[in-house]
């Protein structure tokens, strides 16, 4: 027919398949983030001084590092559990609580840290350029991971959360 435009859809796959791929990618990215963050804290707990301008760590910072290492292990486990088949053994509310908790804590820490660094510093500092955005990235990854998990759960059925249809 003249004047009719047809749009050919080359994607025969279900749209949920793409979102599930994003879920898996985000889960592994969050796992890598937690692993890197944990390794940094292990280095500091073992006496490393990189980032401390040559100063040694006090007792309080040592304990903070130990707590951070434990939280990194939990968050890395959570990231994998949300995208691996073995993760179905755990209640989704437990995994989602962990993911949303990481999102809020890391997001707030990164966001507030960026604002604080901007207000206190006249020049670009290591905190502003690397540390604070790294916290923010972790918060974004865990928030996205939790959202995508909810979106793709129940075999793609429409999910309602707080009366809002998420699909």
Which residues does each PLM region occupy?
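Hydrophobic cores of alpha-helical transmembrane segments in multi-pass inner/ER membrane proteins
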Residues: 2, 8, 67-78, 133-147
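Cytosolic juxtamembrane helix and N-cap/initiation of the first transmembrane helix
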Residues: 2-37, 156, 167
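Juxtamembrane helix-break-helix junctions at the cytosolic face
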Residues: 16-19, 77-100, 153
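Individual transmembrane alpha-helices with interfacial aromatic-anchor signatures
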Residues: 24, 97-98, 123-139
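Hydrophobic transmembrane helix segments
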Residues: 36-64
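Core segments of alpha-helical transmembrane spans in multipass integral membrane proteins
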Residues: 38-40, 60-83, 100-104, 108, ...
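Cytosolic juxtamembrane helix at the C-terminal end of the final transmembrane segment
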Residues: 83-88, 145-166
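Membrane-helix boundary connector in multi-pass membrane proteins
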Residues: 113-127
């Amino acid at each position: 027919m003249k004047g009719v435009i047809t749009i050919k859809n080359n994607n025969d796959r279900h749209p949920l398949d793409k979102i599930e791929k994003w879920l898996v990618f985000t889960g592994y990215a969050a796992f890598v983030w937690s692993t890197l963050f944990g390794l940094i804290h292990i280095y500091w707990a073992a006496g490393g001084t990189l980032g401390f301008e040559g100063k040694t760590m006090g007792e309080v910072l040592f304990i903070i590092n130990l707590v951070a290492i434990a939280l990194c292990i939990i968050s890395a486990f959570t990231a994998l559990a949300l995208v691996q088949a073995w993760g179905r053994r755990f209640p989704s509310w437990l995994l989602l609580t962990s993911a949303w908790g990481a999102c809020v804590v890391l997001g707030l820490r990164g966001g507030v840290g960026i604002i604080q660094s901007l207000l206190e510093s006249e020049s670009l500092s290591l905190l502003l350029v690397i540390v604070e955005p790294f916290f923010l990235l972790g918060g974004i990854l865990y928030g996205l991971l939790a959202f995508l998990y909810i979106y793709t759960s129940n075999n793609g059925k429409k999910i309602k959360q707080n009366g809002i249809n998420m699909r």
